[in-house]
Amino acid sequence: MKPPISIQASEFDSSDEEPADDEQTPIQISWLPLSRVNCSQFLGLCALPGCKFKDVRRNIQKDTEELKSSGIQDVFVFCTRGELSKYRVPNLLDLYQQYGIVTHHHPIPDGGTPDIGSCWEIMEELATCLKNNRKTLIHCYGGLGRSCLVAACLLLYLSDSISPQQAIDSLRDVRGSGAIQTIKQYNYLHEFRDKLAAYLSSRDSLSRSVSR
């Protein structure tokens, strides 16, 4: 019988180690002012807290504590559960709830768009949070594609006076030129109002026919 092989600690891949507290920068939250859509609140956007992927090595506990200390009361998560596992934060939604942060999970595929019914639900939930003066944060993986799309849709939802391009510009002012990442997302935003109006009209028609 061969003796067990002795493995030195230095032989292990150390890439999974948590970064030391002084190595990790605070999680960066961008605050989108909603004053131009007649709302005094700000909407927070950020990248995925606790993410461990490629050269990103964040500490999930530390990030969540920072969100809580920032006063975040509601968080909207657009990552799929598969993504949360891939980026090593499979229990993120549970952790938010443990910290007393109300969690709204609306998974949208990376680079994709929500169906209009789901988007309307997100708009209603966001509008309710903001109306009740709750400090609200939204995020996907990078905080640029899906999150910025939803935030831009919210601007169009809250005001008829803002154009799709103005909404995109507002997001790029706070998140940089990478906001709204795909042609699909760009087109979705430009068609959002018409599609939402058609969806709500058909929904009302169905409701009336059922109530007869």
From Swiss-Prot:
The active site is at 140 (phosphocysteine intermediate). GO terms for cellular component: cytoplasm; cytosol; nucleus; perinuclear region of cytoplasm. Residues 13-24 have a biased composition (Acidic residues). Residues 1-24 are annotated as: Disordered. It is found in: Cytoplasm, Perinuclear region. One of its GO terms (molecular function) is protein tyrosine phosphatase activity. SUPFAM superfamilies: (Phosphotyrosine protein) phosphatases II (SSF52799). Residues 1-34 are annotated as: Interaction with CDK2. It holds the Pfam family CDKN3. Its main location: cytoplasm. One of its GO terms (biological process) is regulation of cell cycle. Interacts with cyclin-dependent kinases such as CDK1, CDK2 and CDK3. Does not interact with CDK4. Interacts (via C-terminus) with phosphorylated CDK2 (via C-terminal helix). Interacts with MS4A3 (via C-terminus); the interaction enhances CDKN3 enzymatic activity. May play a role in cell cycle regulation. Dual specificity phosphatase active toward substrates containing either phosphotyrosine or phosphoserine residues. Dephosphorylates CDK2 at 'Thr-160' in a cyclin-dependent manner. This is Cyclin-dependent kinase inhibitor 3. It comes from Rattus norvegicus.
